[in-house]
């Protein structure tokens, strides 16, 4: 099965509940259409959770883009902070350096789109 979700915004409890409800297994694919961070605590944990899931693909949402612009590209953080990024920023800066670098690489390489063929070969 192919599953798609978006806008979890740090709610790892809801994310885990959804995975339990759909009984996601290794043969399934999960596409997350961005916005797993910000507004609530748990966004950084969600990013690492998705990184460890070989059958999950996170696409770059506007919140991940704002974080990437701020912490990866050294850009302006104001827009991100105005959109609920403070919780995520504090979680990020509490990470060990090695974890920051892993997350930095992950954010840098998130796809903006994927092409799926549904019901075809």
Residue ranges and their predicted role:
Residues 40-121:
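Active-site neighborhood of divalent metal-dependent phosphoester bond hydrolases
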Residues 1-48:
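N-terminal active-site segment of His-dependent metallophosphoesterases
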């Amino acid at each position: 099965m192919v599953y798609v979700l978006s806008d979890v915004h740090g709610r790892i409890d809801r994310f885990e509940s959804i995975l339990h409800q759909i009984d996601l297994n290794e043969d399934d694919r999960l596409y997350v259409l961005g916005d797993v961070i910000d507004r609530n605590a748990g966004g950084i944990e969600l990013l690492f959770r998705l990184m460890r899931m070989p059958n999950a693909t996170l696409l770059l949402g506007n919140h991940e883009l704002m974080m990437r612009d701020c912490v990866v590209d050294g850009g302006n953080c104001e827009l991100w902070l105005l959109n609920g990024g403070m919780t995520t920023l504090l979680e990020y800066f509490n990470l060990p350096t090695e974890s920051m670098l892993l997350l930095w690489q992950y954010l840098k390489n998130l796809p903006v789109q994927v092409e799926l063929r549904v019901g075809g070969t």
